[in-house]
Structure formats: structure tokens, C-alpha cells
Amino acid sequence: MRKSIKSLLVFAFVASITLFMPVKAHAARMGIDVSYHQGAINWSAVKASGVQFAYIRAGSFKSGTDAYFHANMKGAIANGIPVGIYVYSYATTPEQAANEALFAISVAKDYPVSLPIAYDIEDSNHKMLTNAQNVALVNTFCNTISNAGYTPIVYSYRNFFNGRLQGVSQDKWVAQYAAACDYPNPSFWQSSSKGRIGGINGNVDIDYQYKDYSGIINANGFRTQNGKTWYVENYVIHRGWLTLGDKKYYFEPLLGVMQKGLVADGTGIYYMGDDGAMQTGLIDIAGNKFYFDPKTGGMLTNTTITVGKNTYLIDVSGICTDVTEMLKALPALPALPVVPAQ
């Protein structure tokens, strides 16, 4: 009996060590978080430096959109870097926290956000609130984000999580500038504010991702939000033409939004249906008929075609005019006289 008790105590001790073992940087994906402080960023160089994800400061409800938000989002996405956004909080009431969440949603809607939307709660305002008041802010923000179809996460520094954010149940992004993070089970860890990355002038925050969100935020396949559709491959946004089975799709070259309707890619004009798949043959568009080559998908111009029993004259703009009846109405040509052979 004593031996069994001793064994159980040893097992419990080992388990406790494992549970609270500091998180090492080499165990996860490495990324950065950036804002206007970094100025203009060369995202191609950032990608070449091995950065695997980026959190972009959206700004705050109080001060508005970060001056470099759109440039950073477009630059990161164009270089195949998965992105998330974070909002700096000044809220002191749940109503203000809800407005901060709505602000985050409003700036995220035009981009394929591949990471949780982060609530940065660390301001001096929050140090004046009780733990319960801060948790209420977090819950309001995160619930609003979740209700809009996004995944939330809470960012703060280790001591604030241990001080005035106790009881927060949401995923956590913990700032602790040390060789390891000893806060239990962080989803992300901000390990330094003095990192150096190619493409960025000066210091930048270095982050590590530990939680796999692929079961929550799909890493592969079509993703639709706010009426826009993207195609992701391991969180990287596909751009340009994509063939899936017997269907072809076109995603615009910068942000990778799936295109519908008429599309010009520099080589020709194509037509994509409501599902984004390329359509061919004779198609009615806004009351006019156009013909798209079944082999290439490109729109034909300045030619004549026969579809079934009908003949169409196609002008330089691609508009097809049915000339079948017109041709039938033409008088028959007189028979040519037969010239006897000499």
C-alpha cells in the first residue's frame, strides 16, 4: 500500500512538471506581429527570412485604422504569409468592448484572415479595473467576434494574465520576454520585442504558435466570409488560375478573391459562373449573347460561328448577332450556265 501511494505521488509530481514545463521556442511555428511602428515593410524579404505567419495591427476603435494596416495585409497575403489581426483596447465597459469587436470585424471582412482575431488588453485603463471587469470586457469582445463567424484570442503579458485577467477561458497569446514561456498552455507566445527580421527596419516582435487551428479555421479548400471566397492551401491563399477536377477558377492576383462574371487576365476574356467555375459556349450576359471557346474558355470576337442550327455574327466587342433568318431570307443565287467542255 505504501509502495502504491509512493508511486502515485511520483506520477503526480511528474505530471505537474509536464503541465507547467516552460514552453520552448523551437517547439512551434515562428511569426511576427507588426504595426505602424515598423513603417513600410518589404514582405518579400520577410517571407524569405522564414516567417511563417504575421499578426497585423488593425488599430483601435478609439484611434481608427492603423496607418499601415492595409499595406501590411496586402503585402503579407501577396507573399503567401498567413495573417491574423489584433485590436488594441481602451475599453472600460462591455459596450465599448463590443464596439472594438465590431471595428475588428469591419476591417477584417475584406481579407482572408487565417488566424484568430486578437484582443490586445493591456492598457493603463485596464489596470484600474477589477479582474471581473476585465474578464467582462474580454467575454463581450470574444462573443461578438465568435457571433460574426471568426475565432477570438486574448493577448496580454504574463503578469496581467496572472493578475487582472484570471479566469479568462479563451485562448491566450502571452507576452513574456524570456528564453521560455512558463504560463500554462499558451496558444501563442510573444517571446521578444527586439527581434530582427529581413525586410523590416529596426526591431519587431517575435511570436510562436503552439495551437493548431486547422480544425477551426480551415487550412485547405474554399473559404467564404462576408460574400468573398478564397482558396487556401495550408493557409496560403491561392492566386490566379486553379483547376479542380474538370472545373477552372480564377482568383485575382493580389488578395486571391475568387472572381465571378467577366474576367480579363491579360491573355483573354473569360466568364465565371455564380459558383466561380469557368463557363463556355453561348452565354447571355445583360441581354447580349457572347461565345466562349469550349477549348480555351476565351471569348471570341470578330468572327462567325454556328451553334446547332443557328449562325451568329460576332463583332469586335464579342456581341453575337443571330443571322440565321437573315441568311435564309437572302435570294438564291442564279444557277451558273453550264459551259460545254471543249
List each model region and its residues:
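Glycine-rich, charge-decorated loop segments at or immediately adjacent to ligand/cofactor-binding or catalytic sites
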Residues: 96, 160-168
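A mature extracytoplasmic/lumenal domain signature
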Residues: 36-38, 60, 87-89, 123, ...
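Hydrophobic anchor at the start of a short beta-strand
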Residues: 83, 151-153, 172
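Extracellular adhesion/carbohydrate-binding repeat motifs centered on closely spaced tryptophans
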Residues: 217-342
